């Protein structure tokens, strides 16, 4: 990829060059920390005796060049409406999302060790029938039936709710049933989870390991627009970090961040109170480095991309351009400004993402296959070493 980049005149941007300079300048520090007098000695210890400072810089440059060129290739890809439609027609359910509750009844939990696999599976199936019977008319009924099972007498049990779960994330065991076009809210079923093996006589044996009980609540074709939003983050400051690296903030620290967010929103309201003035304030005051340079803007935001509170505010059905608000996340308090809906739908985004992946993989594999294998300098490689394992 690096060779292709150089052939096409691709050059590293200043940020990448600054990254190389920063890493190189820190080598002396790393060498000192690990007990080496010179950076090159540290490099030799890390990468082998043939390592040099120039070689390391060339490696960094090649790595960043390849990475940057790959990104630029992806950014250059565009797809027509016909291409998007054709991809959609290949298997339209792939771009749907499904909502359902499921509960797994493992055969191993039934009967005692003396029982056969078939007997255990039969007991699990009997319970699966019970919790998906005609008297089960709601998720509440489903969970109540699960809780009443004798196998759950000594524990609390309930189904797992999966909301707007992409088809590609649905278990293959239940995917065909879930995605059936005739499926409607309130449908329920149970499906066996099986494995196949070969017995000592060479015969194929199918074993039931349990049953998935499923209660269907709905689906969406994801034909709704993405959104564009600006925000100003008043990040939490201070905090206490534990041995696992988790940081918690006191009520006082959270209150301080909330007050900052409220002050920022009031400052905006007392000014021009336009999108441009919000963007200017974001550039000046936000603690989110990822959006600071573009006025706090996030474009084409899709469901689940942002943390829950941020996401819920953006996709509130009542949201309209110019709306503002404050939401709390684990990062701090966000002053929100709703720019509006994107021209692209979530479904189109999903399809284009797949098209991009297909195009990139084809491009990358073609590049790799066209490269002639060459052997570099191997003089520093020890060939007289024999590794053995103690038995």
Regions of interest found by a model, annotated:
Residues 14-16, 155, 187, 291, ...:
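A generic structural-conservation signal
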Residues 38, 116, 138-141:
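Intrinsically disordered, low-complexity coil/linker segments enriched for acidic/polar
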Residues 126-177, 263-308, 339-345:
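Peptidyl-prolyl cis-trans isomerase
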Residues 3-9, 24-31, 60, 64, ...:
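Sec/Tat-exported extracytoplasmic proteins
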Residues 1-58, 63:
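N-terminal targeting/tethering segments
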Residues 16, 20, 39-40, 121-124, ...:
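Short amphipathic alpha-helical segments that mediate assembly, nucleic-acid/protein binding
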